[in-house]
Amino acid sequence: MQFDADALQQRGFDQVITTDQLCGSDLDVAVSALNQTQDVVFACEQQAQVFEQIQYELSQEDQLNASLSLIDLRDRAGWSAPDASHREITAKQAALLADAQLERPGTPAREVTSNGTCLIIAHDASVLPFAEQLGEELAVTCVLEQPPVTTAPSSNYDLATGKIRSIQGGLGAFDVIFDRFSTLTVSGRGATQFGPTQDGAESTCDIVIDLVNETSLLAAEATRDGYLRAPNPHPIELATLSARAKGLVGTFDKPLYVRYEGSICAHSRSQQTGCTRCIDTCGAKAIRSNGDGVYIDQDMCGGCGGCASVCPTSAILYDDPPFEFLVTRVKTLISTYRGAANSAPRILFVDRSFGKQLIANAARFSRGLPADVIPYEVDNVELIGHAELLAVLGAGASAALILKSPRTAKTAIANQSALTDRLLSGTTVDRQRVAVIEADSIEQLESALYGTALPDPKSFDVALLGGRREVTKQVIAAMTEHDGETPLHIALEPGDPYGTIEVDSDKCTLCLACVSQCPTGALNDRSDRPEINIVENACVQCGLCANTCPETAITLKPQFSLGKQTLDQQPLHGEDPFECIECGRPFGVKSTIEKIIEKLDGKHWMYTDSDNTRLVKMCDDCRVSAQYHDENAPMRGPDRPRVRTTDDYLDS
């Protein structure tokens, strides 16, 4: 493994120390480094727990505040690319070490308390010895589908029979509903007796052990802490379940992976459905409709981040890590590599389970990664959307790659990659610079990475500031060398989160229902005349305007546009107002008023041989006045008697 300490020290480290076995014979070097006040980076993760334990013990003794960062350079930039130049390897190592020094933002979390109340769901009494043993440490209730013929009550567990109907919640807060539920009569003699049955019996518990169901009772079982399932288990599985259940007692921190801001959510308005991208993307089924917005079940959420990558309004934000920090890491990796190697790297997004292990195996048993491929680890690659891919290219990488894992939802990655491809189609950048790699073996991974290097791209001066939509606009503008003024349009497909709308002027009555329903403020009207305007930069193609329009006059037009006009109000449809025949004040829509008059005048008994048609031509104030003084006004009384004067009496 090549490791140039002097070259790396020139890249910003105060001191670079090389060892052969940091976790073994050279462990004293690790202790010495951690026993100081300066921040430390260990370029080895194999014995991370050892180093973290040493740091913890030293901090307890001396109250040290030095931070410890760990990164495995061996798998990523050591045992790799045997034909790579010394300069390339050093550049890659410097980039990874610079990334390791970045201060990671903390993930918000909430406390989850489990007191050890455990529910066991089983077929028959064969599970009772397991319940007896587990009940020595947990508060156990065992619910059997088949009541036992004879069994003695136990002080270690409660026994009941029933069939589970539903289960909701997570660790420390499961809500369970049973049918045919019946509890053991503990005072009976002879055959086992149970009390009266009850449907819809409700209960709560902290831990659920399911020994019955072949399929999970809960959606997203893998993300539900506290739900342990093993249908028809053998003794070894029961022992494992027992150990896991006992470890689920106490207070835990549950990460809150996403934040939700309902005020800018484009899901629904007035019972009309608009954007459903997050609901469609969530493989854990943790998101559901909730009035005008959505509800995210944090107990079900596994933190994949797919919802945030497709949310067009940033109503859902991913916090592990935030998008802004992800971009900071991208810029750090690429700028450090380019500065040292004078060439552009490829960024490979991998997850911390499948992808990381595949890279480690490739490094240990084969050629490993090419010298220009820098792995970027995330918890789940589903959080990588079109904005992240474009940010990589905008920061100066030669390619943005995603390594799929078996647990990755295929549609989420495919849709975002396809959207990126469509956006790049309107630029001068080669669309092959973005790719999704499906590799189940070392050979497939290396086949996809070796021999496919692209020439260094043109360097773009992109700030990469703001959220996903802002970064996307900046990168595409740089790639098209847009002057900021000239209109430019890139055709997209239905469902893409950029575009405008078209209004059929023959159908539209300018009722402005669409304006009132637009969740992003992209649609607006004017105070002086009937008119619909759009700010295209704010349109997310949620479809609420089209679904709300009573005349079906609106059609979505997906496109990505650049230019000053996308930030300004652009008229879609407008007409002159009708002028009141009494006071001249403009009101309503001229064509609508004229159409009403055409359909009523002389064709309806209330508008035949009367002046009622004139009322339609009046503004609201003049109409009230005219009706009040009309001779046929329903509240009109008889004519007021003439006032009699003295002269009247004298004349009489």
Regions found by a protein language model. Name each.
Residues 241, 263, 306-403, 551-652:
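Flanking helices and flexible, charged tails adjoining ferredoxin-like Fe-S electron-transfer domains
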